[in-house]
Amino acid sequence: MSGERAAAARNNAEWCDLVCACHGLPGAFDADAWSVPLRSPPWYPDAVTLRPGVPADALLARIDPGPGASVKDSFADLDLRPYGFQVLFTADWIHRPAADRAAAPAAEVARPLTPVRTPDGLAAWAAVHGGGELFRPALLADPRVTVLARYAADGALTGGAVLNRGGPLTGVSNVFAVDGDATPIWAGIPAAAAGAALVGYESGADLAPALRAGFTTAGPLRVWVRD
């Protein structure tokens, strides 16, 4: 699973880079990591490691390591405690092969996920998801990004997700459901991604619906934060 894990980390770093760019924060990639030199937007890390064994000193030199700093430790092999960091959460990278279209119950895909195409639509999506100004209209103009929404019969937004394409992989993030049951959202994601190979990460109870949708785990990750 090491190749899938590295590919998932790279795709996630590309998504973080897209979000930061929309906020005027250009990121930098090299073989070790992706990073931004200034504080990233809320919920997003200041660095994402892209291989095992990245030296902590070199990684932290690329970011503002003061209070509020965060690092996505993609291979769960860093120890940032000596630098004042604590583990915020652990999670699992997930992967679903291309064209693996396991049938989902009809009730779960009766209302497919549809792309959000307008700034007003994105604002409405963000109001339900949470995050508000985090999701800026520039995301809709990027051909690599698709913001997905699921609507009830009365037009109410009931859930959604974000896809970001990079090479042969499509990343899945920001999966949510208003009623707390994301199973129908995960069930609709493979079709919305046109059968592409999918990667992402989830933790705790959020992992189970992804596994039911045909994903498998590809290794652990950790997110470190400095108080």
Where are these regions (language model features)?
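N-terminal charged segments
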Residues: 1-66, 74, 125-144
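Flexible, substrate/cofactor-facing loop regions flanked by secondary structure
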Residues: 107-174
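Short, well-ordered coil↔helix boundary/capping segments
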Residues: 166-169, 179-184
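Acyl-donor-binding surface of acyltransferase catalytic domains
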Residues: 50-120, 188-189, 197-227
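Terminal substrate-recognition subdomain of acyl/acetyltransferases
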Residues: 1-24, 34-39, 97-108, 138-140, ...
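A conserved acidic, glycine/proline-rich C-terminal tail/linker
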Residues: 182-193
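A short, internal acetyl-CoA/4′-phosphopantetheine-binding micro-motif in the GNAT/acyltransferase core
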Residues: 49-54, 174-182
